[in-house]
Amino acid sequence: AWGVMYDDWHGEINHVPIMAAIGVQDEDKDRALALVESGANVLLIDVAHGDHQNVIDMIHWCKTQDDLVMVDIIAGNIATQSAAETLLAYGADGLRVGIGGGSLCTTRIKTGFGVPNVTSLEDIAKVANVPIMADGGLRTSGDISKALAVGTDESPGKILETPKGLYKRYRGSASLETKVTHGQQERNVEGESTTIPYKGGVKFIVNGLLDGVKSALSYAGAE
């Protein structure tokens, strides 16, 4: 979403958007300051449940730090209009929308919580005058077109060589494998892990996606 702001930012402060993720623990405050000192100018408060007091507290802390005054703060993930209004009221500069929409995510099944992404995006876009990031559930150009239509503005990974060909590891953000990798407790697993065939660089895919989006715009009568 922040890519659309590149021209304005490049002209005003002569650098491109550099985004980095932080959590909501005390140690993340030191991380935030270190990231900005290293060149980050957008911070994403990256938690599964963004409509939470800890997220609000982190937004407030970021907004009261002199060293972060020029830094945009994105908050998420959320799925409801009320959550968006809360985070915006505390100063969020952008929102990340999507709970349970990932193809390997099992949150909606295991917890009963979550909203279809298009519905979330449409509802939140009605009250949000900031950039919105659609997170999860974008598999085809049709999915991208729907996300764009309701208000939203490359996933690299290590290549695995096998006797059957090249693959990439694909993991849900709350999968057991991800939790183990990041040293988290092996509990509250709400995702799966798998391998998918390697399809080449994103440049070989993006043209087809762009063609699909352009076709969707023509059907919608866009000018």
PLM-predicted stretches and their roles:
Residues 83, 89-90, 112-223:
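Alpha/beta catalytic cores of nucleotide-metabolism and tRNA/nucleoside-modifying enzymes
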Residues 1-131, 153, 213:
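Active-site entrance/lid segments in N-terminal catalytic domains of soluble metabolic enzymes
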